[in-house]
A protein has these predicted regions:
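Walker A/P-loop
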Residues: 54-82
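Inter-Walker segment of RecA-like/P-loop motor cores
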Residues: 112-156
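SF2 helicase catalytic motif II
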Residues: 144-146, 161-197
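Alpha-helical scaffold elements adjacent to nucleotide-binding pockets in ATP/GTP-utilizing enzyme cores
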Residues: 82, 103-111, 140, 172, ...
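Non-catalytic accessory segments flanking enzymatic or RNA/DNA-binding domains
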Residues: 2-38
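Conserved Walker A/P-loop ATP-binding site and its immediately adjacent core
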Residues: 72, 76-113, 146
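Residue-level preference for the first positions of well-ordered beta-strands
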Residues: 64-66, 90-92, 138-139, 171
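N-terminal pre-P-loop "Q-motif" helix
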Residues: 34-61
């Protein structure tokens, strides 16, 4: 106490080392600075090229791309790197498996590559949509069950989720989609999109 020794964790030490190495001095504790693996770089490059070419050939349609990635591929990290490369600033991540939220949150908040990015969800320990700084990139995470759920009294969109439906997203990511792809909500979502296109 009141000396030159301070209690801290490994994460704090890594963050301090990274900040000194990169001559950055930030309040945020970002202890991760690993680089992309070759298979992640290849997936990002392939996806980037597909999106660029698709938009040229189909300017009025929305491109879709599936990463059929193995376990431990690092989809969250690779998705964020793709978002940076594409220049996306508003990313919606929807899942049928809400337990994966921490992976999306941790990669965004702890890796040095995503400094300044914001993570929004309905969880208590994250930013709320009212607090988003629109000048900075943000990722909104939520479950299909919540975002596609109906207001019981009106039959319409839940009031708390209205902003999600009204936002023009640069990218919508479906994570762990196979857990609920067969459900009616998911089918209705894609049938409505196909009609619009």
């Amino acid at each position: 106490k009141d000396g030159e020794w301070f209690k801290c964790g490994v994460k704090d030490v890594r963050s301090a080392i990274n900040n000194i190495r990169e001559r950055k001095f930030s309040i945020e504790t970002r202890g991760l600075n690993f680089k992309m693996r070759p298979e992640q770089k290849a997936a990002i490059e392939k996806t980037f090229n597909y999106f660029q070419n698709y938009k040229k050939e189909n300017p009025d349609k929305t491109p879709h791309f599936l990463w059929n990635a193995k376990m431990r591929f690092g989809k969250t990290f690779a998705t964020y790197q793709l978002a940076k490369k594409m220049g996306w600033t508003k990313i919606l991540v929807m899942t049928f498996k809400p337990a994966v939220e921490s992976a999306w949150d941790d990669d965004l908040k702890e890796h040095v590559d995503f400094e300044g990015w914001q993570f929004v969800s309905a969880s208590e320990n994250t930013l709320w949509h009212e607090d988003i700084d629109e000048r900075r990139p943000f990722v909104c995470f939520g479950s299909f069950q919540d975002y596609l759920g109906k207001n019981k009294s009106t039959g319409g969109i839940k009031t708390k989720n209205k902003w999600v439906h009204e936002t023009k997203w640069d990218c919508v990511v479906f994570d762990e989609y196979h857990y609920g792809a067969w459900r009616e909500n998911a089918k209705e979502l894609f049938e409505a999109e196909d009609k619009e296109e």
